[in-house]
Regions:
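Ligand-binding pockets and gating/stacking loops
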Residues: 1-231
């Protein structure tokens, strides 16, 4: 049994770990503040895990429909893949965005109220941006034309809170169409370097060996933590 298998077994058999996953121990008011749908309850679980020393937790906000009191929406989409063939982007957003806003604001307030903001960094992001212009296609479920947005790697976002960083600022901007960066372009390698910095890792010098024993750096050459946040 290698070190990873041993750690997995310890996690599954530890009474403390089982207790961390029991979110019914949370006060009803706290659970309701986050919202009783899966996104809110998963966020509470994430906080309970970091309270117990878990260094990295991922919450995937997918499929808000049909559970937690959220009715199924024919024009909605399982994830955030808002192509016109998948969803009516405006109808989907009217359901999805208020849920997102409630969970994220509740998480930030909760972390600060518990004093966790000094050692916990909350990062909210996606895999890439969306086209500045809408496309219109027949929906795969609705069979009628509906608006959507396709993949757009030229501009994206990352929202950060906590982690003892310099917050209250917007770093970088795009043109008025959300098409291209025009001021302080930020590469995601800089974001990654910033996250490693928060974890206490020197991303510019630390390497990880692959299965052939070859060293790989954690970030691309020249990538540094964002000076606006950690300087």
């Amino acid at each position: 049994m290698d070190v990873f298998n041993r750690k997995a077994m310890e996690m599954m058999t530890s009474p403390a770990e089982r207790e961390a996953f029991d979110i019914t121990q949370e006060k009803d008011a706290v659970r309701e503040r986050f919202a009783m749908h899966p996104w809110g309850q998963q966020a509470i679980l994430a906080r309970r895990l970091v309270e117990r020393g878990v260094p990295w937790v991922t919450v995937v906000m997918e499929n808000p429909y049909g559970v937690g009191g959220i009715p199924w929406l024919k024009e909605g989409v399982y994830n955030w893949d808002s192509h016109a063939v998948n969803c009516h982007i405006f109808k989907d957003a009217k359901v999805r965005f208020p849920l997102y806003d409630q969970v994220i604001t509740a998480m930030i307030e909760d972390l600060y109220a518990r004093g966790l903001d000094k050692r916990v960094l909350l990062v909210v992001t996606g895999e890439f941006g969306r086209t500045p212009r809408l496309t219109v296609r027949p929906g795969s479920r609705t069979k009628v034309d509906q608006p959507g947005r396709d993949h757009w790697p030229r501009a994206n976002f990352a929202f950060l809170a906590g982690g003892s960083m310099n917050h209250g600022q917007i770093i970088g901007s795009t043109d008025k169409h959300g098409n291209e960066p025009v001021d302080r372009p930020v590469k995601f390698q800089e974001v990654f370097a910033t996250l490693y910095h928060c974890l206490g890792l020197d991303a510019t010098n630390t390497t990880v060996k692959d299965h052939q024993g070859r060293p790989h750096y954690l970030v691309d050459a020249g990538s540094r933590p964002m000076r606006e946040l950690v300087g």
